[in-house]
Amino acid sequence: VYPIEALAPVDDSAHPGLWFKSYARQQALRRRQTAEIYPEFGPHLNGGFLSHVAGKVFIRTRIPKVNFRIHNGFVQGEQLSAETSLAETKLCHLHARDFDHFLQAYRYRLARGSYRADLKPAPTPDGAGLNLNALFSLLETEGGEAALRRFYAEVCEASPALRARLADHDHLHRIDLDLAAKRARFFPQTASTVAK
């Protein structure tokens, strides 16, 4: 199941639900579209995402000697190769719901999380490129928090301009998660005590 990543609301007049972005599965098309959608930072991004694009796997647990990893599974030490893509299923990833949330998680992600130095950069034809750790470190060194905010505004905020560019490439999704209703349905005894 491949992810879609939530965009941060830019005003309080939003309809129910959140805007999400997706990306092209084919690598060359993804590179081209990402550069078009995110004009300043696209060349350094994998599909415009701050997190993974690998998706998640669902594996039958009764398979003998199965081992799970975050983005794949192994049976008897061999990575699973047979897969069925659930194209109609959307894995909604809420990576950075607003700039303050982005900053709160930033240092941890830079050191030990999804922006750490040992992760590969977005694939490019020449193999050169900055990974998110190098990009964020460069931005922060040259422009401080204002540069990080500029990045966040282009890549993460559901501005009308970004939504239009995503829609032009069929990568804009509107989803009403309605988490309060889901909690009430599946956990009626605790739904009213959970912070909304």
Where is each model-derived feature located?
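Catalytic-site signature of metal-activated, phosphate-bearing donor transferases
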Residues: 1-196
